[in-house]
Amino acid sequence: MPLQVGRYAIYQLDSTNFYHYGQLDTLTQYLAKDSVESFFVDTPGDTSWVVVRYLSPATGTPVWTANETNVVNASSRSVDLTENNLRFIKLAYPMQNGITWSGNSYIPDDPYDSYGFTAPKNVNLSDWTYTYQNVNQPFTAGGKTYDSAVTILQVDDSSNVNISIIVDTSFASRTYWSETYAKDVGLVYRNTILWDYQPPPPQTTQSGYKIGFKITLTLLDHN
């Protein structure tokens, strides 16, 4: 969204968590409202904006509850987002097709250690290379087409996911993250997939299991 106090964006948030031994995929749906609530000027003289995310049940009249506070830092070099205490370099300049940068250079190793990932791209996010795609092209999200948008492919890596059935003895993983921003609007779509499939130990009756998460954000409304 444009960075100005009082601006907001409302998203459909679909969150899927993959759990260990129950092999249960749990989908939770929310409305998420990102609201620009204040700003400050940091030591280098760049402006940082405080964005509060509110969540509401996806159905019925929205009842907003503050969930997290994030910070967007805008400079002449980049736009950084600190989300859940992780700082991402979301946009870099110049904004041209094929331009790449290390968007996770501030991210420590294994930031999602609670999941127990072992796939290298799920552990070492600093190895990701962000790439601009489809600069100034139309993009459709939430039933609306935006005339000028840009997609950032942050990572697209996989192991053994193209076979129709994962063999019990095979390790598999998926690491994918892309975001699309529309001109004068901001983030309109985010798709995040990080999971490992762990095969069962040999000569046991224990089943294999998937660990990780999938999150999509789709813009519904903004001011």
What residue ranges belong to the model's regions?
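Conserved functional acidic sites
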Residues: M1-N223
